[in-house]
Amino acid sequence: MNSKIVMCGCTESGVETLEFLIEQNITINYIVSLDEEQAKKWNVSGYCSFEKLSKKYNIPIYYPESYSLNQKEDLDFFQHHSFDLLILGGWQRLIPDNILSTLKIGGIGVHGSSEMLPKGRGRSPVNWSLIEGKNRYILQLFLMTPGIDDGDILDFQTFDINKWDTCRTVYYKISVVQKRKLLELIPKIIKNEFKRIPQTGEPTFYPKRTPDDGLINWNQTSEKLYDFIRAITKPYPGAFSYLDNKKIKIWKAQPFDNKITYDQNKVGQIVEIFSSGDFVVNCYTGSLLVTEYDGTVSLSKIFTS
C-alpha cells in the first residue's frame, strides 16, 4: 500500500486506533495533532498526546497553527505533502474545503449517535445519547465534506449502550469498532472498491456542550440524573452543583431507591451520609446515591443550581 496517509487526532481513541492500524501493517505517513498547550487553549476534552507513538514508530507530527486548520501555514503543510487519504481519529473540528481539496482520494470522518445519519449530526453525540437515555449507538464512517457530518456513508456498526455505560466506556466501544472498520475500509478506499451510501431524510443536529452545561437540575427523576452524570463524567469536566455557594463536582452516582422515600425533605437535599462518605440526595422522584465526588458535604444541606 503505497498511498500517503495522514491521521488527524488528539484523543485516546485516536492514539489507540493509530497504533492498531500500524500493527496491522497500514502505513501512516504523518500525524496532525495538538500539543498539551494547544489542547488547553482550545479546551479539548479527553486530550491525549501522540508524541510517544510518533517516536516509537518514527512518524513525524505536524502541530497546526489552528485547531480548525484554517491558517495559511496549515494549508501550506497539506499542499506540500499532497496526501492521498486523511483519517480522523479524535479531531473535534470540521476540516476546511481547501484542505480536503489537497487530498487525492479524500478523507474518512467518524461520527455516531443513536440514529443513522443525517439524524444526530453535530457536537457531543456520545454525551447527548447518554443524557437522552438511548440504548444503542451507531458508529458511522463517512466521506468527509466541509459540511457537518453530511458526507456519503462508507460503513457503520451498531453497538449497545447499556445501563452501566459511561461516556468513557462508550468511547472504549467506539475505539474497538473504529479500529476494525478502518482496517477493513482503508484498503478498499485505496483500491477504489468501496460503496457510498448517500444520506437521506431530514437532518437533526446536536448542539455544542460547554462545562457550564454540567450544572445539575435536581428537579428530575433519579434515573434522569444518573444518565446526566454518567454522560459527562471523566474525561469530561463533569456534573456539578452548589452547597453554600461552593461547587461540588459529582463524578459517579446511581439511583438509590424509589420505595425508601424522603417525602418530608426537599428536592436536592442531602438525606443520608454513610461512613464511607457516600451520600444520598432526595430527587423529584426517588433518590440518588453519590459515590464519587469532589468537595465537602453535610447532612440536611440542600444543593442549589
PLM feature spans:
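Short, structured protein-protein interaction patches enriched in aromatics and acidic/basic residues
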Residues: 242-255
